[in-house]
């Protein structure tokens, strides 16, 4: 095999390994007729999971952004159940606290309805995220238990992580 053949095989192998380090969730509105609004990509880094939204048609401002324990967005997002909490902390302390792992950094939506600002969830591992739901709430997030679940409010968009 010549040198260019070896380089080509190495490139293909490296590319497939890089692809394996991403998970994607197509995101849909949670209304009676769900509409596709984009996707969220999750990438493992040495510092945690990089979360890269590519979303449109959302209300401007900060939104609660969480992992939910069941990979089902049915019934207006209610089938996704509660926040992902594998250690049963029952505590909402944000992505940098010691509470449940379902807290993601707040999702910011610009005045044109787009969310594209990447964030980092330092306590998460990509291997923990298979078959979970990612949820976007109507309101911002206080990262506390008062109001309940940080005050995120209604579930306005949801996707299953694949």
UniProtKB/Swiss-Prot annotation:
Its EC number is 1.15.1.1. It catalyses: 2 superoxide + 2 H(+) = H2O2 + O2. Pfam families: Sod_Cu (PF00080). Transmembrane segments: none annotated. The keyword Disulfide bond applies. Zn(2+) binds at residues 83, 92, 100, 103. Disulfide bonds join 73-158. Residues 1-20 form the signal peptide. Keywords: Antioxidant, Copper, Disulfide bond, Metal-binding, Oxidoreductase, Periplasm, Signal, Zinc. Cu cation binds at residues 66, 68, 83, 137. CDD domains: Cu-Zn_Superoxide_Dismutase. It comes from the Bacteria. InterPro entries: SOD-like_Cu/Zn_dom_sf, SOD_Cu/Zn_/chaperone, SOD_Cu/Zn_BS, SOD_Cu_Zn_dom. GO terms for cellular component: periplasmic space. It is an enzyme of class 1 (oxidoreductase). GO terms for molecular function: copper ion binding; superoxide dismutase activity. The keyword Phosphoprotein does not apply. Destroys radicals which are normally produced within the cells and which are toxic to biological systems. Belongs to the Cu-Zn superoxide dismutase family. Homodimer. This is Superoxide dismutase [Cu-Zn]. The lineage of its organism: Bacteria, Pseudomonadati, Pseudomonadota, Gammaproteobacteria, Legionellales.
């Amino acid at each position: 095999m010549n040198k260019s053949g070896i380089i080509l095989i190495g490139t293909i192998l490296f590319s497939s390994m890089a692809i394996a380090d991403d998970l994607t969730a197509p995101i849909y509105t949670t209304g009676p007729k769900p509409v596709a609004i984009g996707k969220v990509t999750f990438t493992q880094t040495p510092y945690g999971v990089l979360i890269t939204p590519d979303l449109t048609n959302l209300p401007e401002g900060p939104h609660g952004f969480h992992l939910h324990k069941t990979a089902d967005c049915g019934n207006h997002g209610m089938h996704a159940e509660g926040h992902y909490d594998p250690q049963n902390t029952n505590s909402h302390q944000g992505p940098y606290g010691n509470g449940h792992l379902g807290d993601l950094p707040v999702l910011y939506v610009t005045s044109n309805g787009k969310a594209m600002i990447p964030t980092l969830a330092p306590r998460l591992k990509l291997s923990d995220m298979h078959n979970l739901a990612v949820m976007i709430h109507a309101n911002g997030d206080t990262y506390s238990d008062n109001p309940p679940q940080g005050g995120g409010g209604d579930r306005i968009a949801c996707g299953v992580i694949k």
